[in-house]
Amino acid sequence: MSSQSYRERTLVSVIGDDDTVTGMLLAGTGQVNENGDKNFFIITQKTTDEQIAEAFDDYTTKRKDIAIVLINQFAAERIRDRIENHVQAFPAVLEIPSKDDPYDPEKDSILRRVRKIIGE
């Protein structure tokens, strides 16, 4: 990937519950591009794993303006295979806690990779 394409990645996207996404939008991360594509995806009780995976794939492979994907850890667990298979530097995928589900560092794929590298 050229350095020019890295410069085009300026957005943070979020996949999560209503409270997490609302907080990120209030922080100013929300964006809708000229095609009507949003950089956020709200998970409800009716959201399927396939819909979460589709949003993740959109943000990590199709969109070239996303630099960071924040995903609630409970959602990452639902698409763990895709999270584990994402090895590109950009966009970076970071698992974050939600209001109802505490963060478990043992489930975080990035921390597991770091521990493997440093030999823990």
From Swiss-Prot:
Chief localisation class: membrane
GO aspect biological process, one term: proton transmembrane transport
Annotated compartments: Vacuole membrane
Membrane topology per record: Peripheral membrane protein
Role noted for this protein: Subunit of the V1 complex of vacuolar(H+)-ATPase (V-ATPase), a multisubunit enzyme composed of a peripheral complex (V1) that hydrolyzes ATP and a membrane integral complex (V0) that translocates protons. V-ATPase is responsible for acidifying and maintaining the pH of intracellular compartments.
Subunit details: V-ATPase is a heteromultimeric enzyme composed of a peripheral catalytic V1 complex (components A to H) attached to an integral membrane V0 proton pore complex (components: a, c, c', c'', d, e, f and VOA1).
Protein name: V-type proton ATPase subunit F
Organism: Schizosaccharomyces pombe (strain 972 / ATCC 24843)
Lineage, highest ranks first: Eukaryota, Fungi, Dikarya, Ascomycota, Taphrinomycotina
